[in-house]
Amino acid sequence: MKTKEVVDDITMNRAITRITYEIIERNKELNQVVLAGIKTRGVHLAHRIQKRLAQLEQIDIPVAEIDTKPFRDDKKSQEADSTLIPVDITDRQVILIDDVLYTGRTIRAAIDNLVSHGRPSRVSLAVLVDRGHRELPIRTDYIGKNIPTSRTEEIIVEMTETDGQDRILIKGE
C-alpha cells in the first residue's frame, strides 16, 4: 500500500487557525462555549484551538475529553468510559472536535455520550478532515480540509503530541 502526504504541517496549522477564526465569528458568547475533543487526536485539536482562542480573544475556554468507545454501535467495548467533562454542559454551546469525519458513527457515539452528561443548548461539529462516505446524516459546521477519498483509502492524521510531527496522509493502493 502506498502512503502519500497530502497536507504538510504549515497547511495543517493554517486549517486549525481557520477553524478557530470561524468559531470566533459564529459564537457571539464565547464564554458559553465548551470544546469537546473526541479522544485521541480530537482532544489535541481542541487544546490547540483553546490555545489560539486564548491568544486571539483572551478567554479560557474549557476542554472536555469525549470517549466514544462505550457508545459505539459498530464496535462493542468493555472498557470503562474515560470521558472527562470539567464543567456543566447544560445550556452551553458544545463544539465537538475530531480529526477525521468519515461514516459519522464516531460523532453519533460522541453525541450519545455528551447528552448523557447534560443538555447543551447547541452541539456543533469541527473536524480537521472531511473525507466523505457518510452512513449517518451528520454534517460538519467547521472544517479544515475536504479530502475526497475512496472507501479503500485511509486518512491518517499525525500530530506532534502523539506522532512527533504534524501532517495528513492518504494510505491506499
Swiss-Prot record:
InterPro entries: PRibTrfase_dom, PRTase-like, PyrR, PyrR_bifunctional
Superkingdom of source: Bacteria
Coiled coil start-end: none
EC number in record: 2.4.2.9
Record's keyword terms, sorted: Glycosyltransferase, RNA-binding, Transcription, Transcription regulation, Transcription termination, Transferase
Motif PRPP-binding per record, residues: 94-106
Reactions performed catalytically: UMP + diphosphate = 5-phospho-alpha-D-ribose 1-diphosphate + uracil
Record-stated family: Belongs to the purine/pyrimidine phosphoribosyltransferase family. PyrR subfamily.
PANTHER family for this protein: BIFUNCTIONAL PROTEIN PYRR (PTHR11608:SF0)
HAMAP family associated with the record: PyrR
Role: Regulates transcriptional attenuation of the pyrimidine nucleotide (pyr) operon by binding in a uridine-dependent manner to specific sites on pyr mRNA. This disrupts an antiterminator hairpin in the RNA and favors formation of a downstream transcription terminator, leading to a reduced expression of downstream genes. Also displays a weak uracil phosphoribosyltransferase activity which is not physiologically significant.
UniProt name for this protein: Bifunctional protein PyrR
